[in-house]
Amino acid sequence: RVGHVGKVTAGSFNVGDKVTLTVDEKKRIDTAKNHSATHLLQEALRIVLGNHVEQAGSLVTPDRLRFDFTHFQPMTEEEIEKVEAIVNEQIAKSIDVETKVLAIEDAKKTGAKALFNEKYGDTVRVVCMGDFSKEFCGGTHVSNTGLINSFKIVSESGVAAGVRRIEALTGNGAFAYYKDIEKKYNDICKAAKATPANVEEKIAHMQAEIKSLNSEIESLKNK
């Protein structure tokens, strides 16, 4: 049996009324994508940064995911790119996601990761993504990593001493992020009267010109 806690946001009902509850299919699917991506992310972080990485907190919503982990310094741009590439590689492999309910001792023998200081019962649910990721977890997941579609890290920051935070998007959220970046990039090209091929050169030229003009202004002020 599974118990759910809900909140009435519209309408009303009374004790004794018979009601039918349904899950918001889209929110459930998007949440599952972000949750499964979090498992892939943790393993990718351990590959890139080292086995000292442990989960220190997590938030999964239909719109995004947030993952806190133990690490002693800010991640470099190269490290972030490597982690992102590994996660997307596992998504592209379309790995079946399997769940098993095992006795706690049998679950530990599989090598599945457990949350530090978390108390578990006699049986636990293990979520396996091929040989890449095995974790104790009771949450909702996709049935295949390919259903996540895509993964994009949008920020990496510190939240406490020795704890870093990654925020990321998957699926349609990642696609919308890329479209927004593309629009901003095109707007910059238009403002600079440049093309995507020469916009960096054009902006560098404009900056040099501004610097030169500012020097001339300062020179005139001193006369």
Explain the meaning of each model-derived region:
Residues 1-223:
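A glycine- and charged-residue-rich anion-binding loop/surface
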